[in-house]
UniProtKB/Swiss-Prot annotation:
Gene: coaD
SUPFAM superfamilies: Nucleotidylyl transferase
Native species: Streptococcus pneumoniae (strain Hungary19A-6)
Enzyme kind, highest EC tier: transferase
Protein name: Phosphopantetheine adenylyltransferase
Gene Ontology cellular component annotations, sorted alphabetically: cytoplasm
InterPro entries, sorted: Cyt_trans-like, PPAT, Rossmann-like_a/b/a_fold
Amino acid sequence: MSDKIGLFTGSFDPMTNGHLDIIERASRLFDKLYVGIFFNPHKQGFLPLENRKRGLEKALGHLENVEVVASHDKLVVDVAKRLGATFLVRGLRNAADLQYEASFDYYNHQLSSDIETIYLHSRPEHLYISSSGVRELLKFGQDIACHVPESILEEIRNEKKD
């Protein structure tokens, strides 16, 4: 029997404790879980890709079966095929997330019918945490320590120094 390989993607700009919770839970479901940082090279991100990748690798270092990868200008299903992943993992906070994700699931299934999407519901304590919300708090100088892993906080602080 072949290994169960999953792929969880996002921009992780920045990674939140909600992302971390989904990744930790998903890592128990798969032999190998890839965490893919997907980004649009034509958009200005909050944190540079290198900082995001380094922060995620530190935050996920305790998970032996998890590997962080980065991609741009590629479809998720193409990256999944390249990595041998047959499952896409998505986190859901609310009904709006489900509706948003359902359209991607439709297209992904059209492009690769052998790849399934697995949905994990956010824990109640993470329902209202989002990367955009964290960026908004930072914009106004607010403390975000309770919303992001320590390694992400370090990357944000280091980026502000530069």
